[in-house]
Regions:
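A cross-family signal for key residues in well-ordered alpha-helices
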Residues: 22, 53, 104
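N-terminal secretory signal peptides
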Residues: 1-19
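N-terminal export leaders
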Residues: 16-33
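Zn2+-dependent cytidine deaminase-like catalytic core
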Residues: 82-158
């Protein structure tokens, strides 16, 4: 469900706002920014299937517990080192997204907050908070969705 707009708020698609932003930052800067946030759109190969299935299992676990339907796993050197269902509702923690839970689990199991060389698999494209957490943890790449869309390397964005 879309959130109602605040009184006087300018919709993001407003042509006047777009024109203003173009004048302010220049068309080239806007085109560059748009290309920087567009991830590669290709599906993962068959070698990723077991991890996509494991993320779906985490999603099913979240739903069975009465939580939001999201799941994620962290993989290093071909083995799962962390997993997590969404616990936002059950833990009453707005930061307990599946990706964050999987990153926390992997860090605990590996004994390090540095997850360099790890891959994150998620049932949906991670939100900005989760992608930023993956970035700061050093996650190498992430895949999302039922067919494992290649989301590229995690990056910071606004």
């Amino acid at each position: 469900m879309a959130e109602p707009e605040a009184a006087g708020a300018v919709p993001a698609t407003d042509p006047e706002r777009r024109a203003f932003m173009t004048r302010l930052f220049g068309a080239g800067a806007l085109a560059l920014a748009a290309s920087a946030v567009a991830p590669p759109a290709r599906a993962a190969g068959p070698e990723h299937a077991p991890f996509i299935v494991r993320a779906q299992d985490m999603r099913a676990r979240a739903l069975a517990a009465g939580d939001q339907g999201f799941g994620a796993v962290v993989v290093k050197d071909g083995r799962v080192v962390g997993d997590g269902p969404s616990r936002v509702v059950t833990a009453t923690d707005p930061t307990a997204h599946a990706e964050i839970e999987a990153i926390r689990d992997a860090a605990r199991k590996l004994g390090s907050s540095n997850l360099a060389g790890c891959i994150l698999y998620s049932t949906f494209r991670p939100c900005r908070m989760c992608e930023a957490a993956a970035y700061w943890a050093g996650v190498q790449r992430f895949y999302h969705g039922a067919d494992g869309q290649d989301g590229g390397a995690p990056r910071l964005g606004c």
